[in-house]
Amino acid sequence: MYSVISEKISETITLQRQTSSRYIEFFVFRNVDINELWTTDISEDKTHDVWPAINEKSFKKFLENELTSYQRPISLLGIPQNGTVSKTCKREKQRETDCVNYVRKHGNPVTFYPRHRAKRNANTDTCISEEPSILVSHHRNSKMDVFMDANKITLVNRELIWVPHDQVRIVKLDISLCIPDGFFGVIIGHSNDVFCECITEIITDETDISVFLMNLSEHSLMLLPGDVEFSINFLPCYIPEPWEMINLSPPESAVFHLKTCREFIIKPNSYTIQCFDAMYVCADELKALMIPSKEIIKLGLLIETYIWNKDTIPSIKIFNSTRKTIYIPTGICIARIIFTCGHFCLSLMPERAINRLQVLDASSFFLFHYAAFSNA
């Protein structure tokens, strides 16, 4: 049975997701007055007192009209205004993979897959025959143990990791990922040593993934097995149109680069907050995730991950952990930016130099294919 899950036209629409849905939910919408589909009678003694009752005949007649298939990842909450929302399949018709199938008018079910914006909003539907999956290739001699959950990959060090004093240690994870088109990965690390900071990293489709560890103490650190943990979460990415961006260069593999517009210096063991003349005007449910660039990290600068919202200018907090004054010239890349509909928050870490990013999209599921390899 179909059910309308929007309250009023031209107001904020709240979506209700099925608990068994794993990957994608498809909705259909059309510019009509939703009040025509609702009856004015509201039951007082049943649960219908929350939502208006639905005239099933009128609603079925509406569904027989020409509808537009609108594809969105389940984490992308909210739809364009002036739309009527409905589920396009029944729960008992879902496959074991829990992918939602949209049945065309001729009756043939097709499984869709969220691609990038150009393909997702194209006139022709983009479909695949298999469930979207992520290929994980792990080196047998890796220093990391790999644990695959329903929606993320966790890596824990199984060997000692030496982080020299006043240096940035680059640790190769000896793992490669084949990420489907339209998704990206974000690596969030945590160390049991309060003087060791794990730098957040984003990945699109890399075969040689490495992370940065920064030593903030006055002596070298020896991290024992199990002291460092990395979580790789996968989220849908989004490429805004050129007219939706202000003072940002074209992206490279869905990643934008934020460059300095003026020179500045950072004194030893001190913070500075830099604002940038950039802005974007995308949809409300989209946000930009700003990750420090590798050039800045290698200088010994610690940048806090920033969640950039629309209609605002970004302000980045930079910490100089070295004992020397660092000069930043004009035009250097400070941060990398990727747009997504994922949900994040910054966990307050009073004992740490910077706060830690936390991914809140725990309802998404992925199919991981694991393969171990070794050098010939």
From Swiss-Prot:
It catalyses: dUTP + H2O = dUMP + diphosphate + H(+). InterPro entries: dUTPase-like, dUTPase-like_sf, HSV_DUT. The keyword Lyase does not apply. Keywords: Hydrolase, Magnesium, Metal-binding, Nucleotide metabolism. It comes from the Viruses. It is an enzyme of class 3 (hydrolase). Pfam families: dUTPase. One of its GO terms (molecular function) is metal ion binding. Its cofactor is Mg(2+). Its EC number is 3.6.1.23. Involved in nucleotide metabolism: produces dUMP, the immediate precursor of thymidine nucleotides and decreases the intracellular concentration of dUTP to avoid uracil incorporation into viral DNA. Belongs to the dUTPase family. This is Deoxyuridine 5'-triphosphate nucleotidohydrolase. It comes from Human herpesvirus 6B (strain Z29) (HHV-6 variant B). The gene is DUT.
